[in-house]
Amino acid sequence: DGFFKKFTQTITYAPNFISVVVISGMVIAFLSPSTGIINHLLSFFGMERISFLEDPRWFKTVYVLSGVWQGTGWGSVIYLAALSGVDTQLHEAATIDGATRLQRMWYINIPTIVPTMVILLIMNVGSIMATGYEKILLLQNPLNMESSNVIATFVYKQGLLEAQYSFAAAVGLFESVINAILLIIVNKISRKLGDTSLW
């Protein structure tokens, strides 16, 4: 039980402290059609090997799942910190009243950490278009270009490769404005529905 806990914590927290280059290298190694562990498992269960990074249909799934894995550690630390602020007397009183563990989680833990959840949601919505070009460029190849060419990579190529600095700056500014508008809208909705907001 202790080993499983440490193993889970390691694979959850470690990606948050590893560079994007290393994460991308691990993803490429895990998903390799010939030597990747994922395709070895597919072959073991009698399924056909999949070229995840060569097939445009799989690129978005790979990018999102690797991003979730990479960000889980940071989110876990934030939520654990929020849970540590839950009043233990509430749990003790609920236990005396006969509340089950699930009921204590639902009626004590979740309502207590709702403000933290709302703040994280607002911050994530504010950066919803900021995909980050580093990992996409590292995972990108000519075969998955139709799925992997996003605003961030477009700005990078136009600005640094094509030397169209003004155009790249305009596109980047447009992306920032959209993010700011979304942030303001979600913050206003949060302030109207509850007492939690960024400002």
What do these predicted regions represent?
Residues 1-199:
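A structural signal for multi-pass alpha-helical bundles of membrane permease subunits
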